[in-house]
Design a protein with these regions (language model features):
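Terminal targeting signals and extreme-terminal segments of soluble enzymes
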Residues: 1-135
Length: 135
C-alpha cells in the first residue's frame, strides 16, 4: 500500500467492520500516522479513552506501516508491550508508527499515541510482528 488512498481502500474492504473508525493521514517507508475520533463506547469511567481503544489504534498504525513495505496481509502480532503515560482527554487520538527493524521473519517497531489536546504523548507501544514465510 503505497498511498493513503490505497490503504484506506484496503481497510474498507478487509476490515469493513471497523475501517471507518480510522483516518489514515500519512504513510511512507517505515512510518504511518493514523487518527481515531473516539465515540461514546470508547470511553471508560472517569471520562477518558479506554486502554483497548489505544491498543486498537496502535495496532492499526503499525500494521499500516508494515503493509507499505510488504503488501502481504498475513503478518501477525507476536509480542506487544504498552506504556500508558497520561490519561487522554476525550479528543481525537493520533498514532505515529515507526518500524525500527524490518527483517525476513520479524518486524519490530514502536507506536507513539497522543491526543489532540495533550502536549506530550499519552502512551507508547512496542511491538513485534511475524512476517509470513516465503516459499
Amino acid at each position: 500500500m503505497k498511498s493513503v488512498e490505497d490503504l484506506t481502500a484496503y481497510f474498507d474492504k478487509v476490515f469493513f467492520q471497523k475501517a471507518s473508525r480510522f483516518e489514515f493521514l500519512e504513510i511512507d517507508d517505515g512510518h504511518s500516522l493514523v487518527k481515531l475520533s473516539p465515540e461514546e463506547q470508547d470511553l471508560r469511567p472517569g471520562n477518558t479513552i479506554s486502554g483497548p481503544v489505544m491498543f486498537e489504534i496502535a495496532d492499526c498504525a503499525f500494521y499500516a506501516a508494515i503493509l507499505f513495505k510488504d503488501p502481504d496481509p498475513m503478518s501477525v502480532t507476536v509480542n506487544w508491550s504498552m506504556n500508558f503515560f497520561k490519561r487522554p482527554s476525550v479528543s481525537d487520538l493520533f498514532a505515529k508508527a515507526t518500524i525500527l527493524k524490518f527483517g525476513q521473519k520479524l518486524v519490530v517497531g514502536e507506536v507513539t499515541i497522543y491526543s489532540e489536546t495533550a502536549k506530550n504523548s499519552v502512551a507508547q507501544a512496542m511491538m513485534t510482528y511475524a512476517r509470513p514465510i516465503k516459499k
